[in-house]
Amino acid sequence: MKELTKNKKAWHNFTIIENFEAGIVLKGSEVKALRMGRANLKDSFCRIIKGELFLLNAHISFLENTNAFFRPSENGARKLLMHKKEINRLFGAVSKEGMAIVALSLYLNDKNKVKARIALAKGKNLHDKREALKRKEAEREAQSAMKRYAKGY
């Protein structure tokens, strides 16, 4: 499994509740661009439209040598492929509990197919983000103190 791109902001802005794997409908030039690392999931999100799941606002740059006729839009909606039962479960959670569906990463599976890792997530408040940063900083300081103690300084 080779990770092509990752949404690091999702872990900072959301509390991840459950992960899912979804196929993604792409054109050939988009797959080439992904393999070259020309993608960004920073502000991307998923939405259910007419019973189908779409990845919105994911930026996949087109290649310069792609014919202008075949160039897909860089931020266009891309259909995600999941079982109907999973989509209905996501729809129920999003509509009832105020959750969001967030794209975490795009990767190649063992059969070299591009897959999207999406998550059911709940937004963090500002104080939750600050607590997480404080906790991370405290862990980092504790680790460095343990290393210094082990070395004998």
Curated annotation (Swiss-Prot):
Residues 132-142 have a biased composition (Basic and acidic residues). SUPFAM superfamilies: Small protein B (SmpB). One of its GO terms (molecular function) is RNA binding. The keyword Cell wall biogenesis/degradation does not apply. One of its GO terms (biological process) is trans-translation. Residues 132-153 are annotated as: Disordered. CDD domains: SmpB (cd09294). InterPro entries: SmpB, SsrA-bd_prot, SsrA-bd_prot_CS. The keyword Signal does not apply. This is SsrA-binding protein. It comes from Campylobacter hominis (strain ATCC BAA-381 / DSM 21671 / CCUG 45161 / LMG 19568 / NCTC 13146 / CH001A).
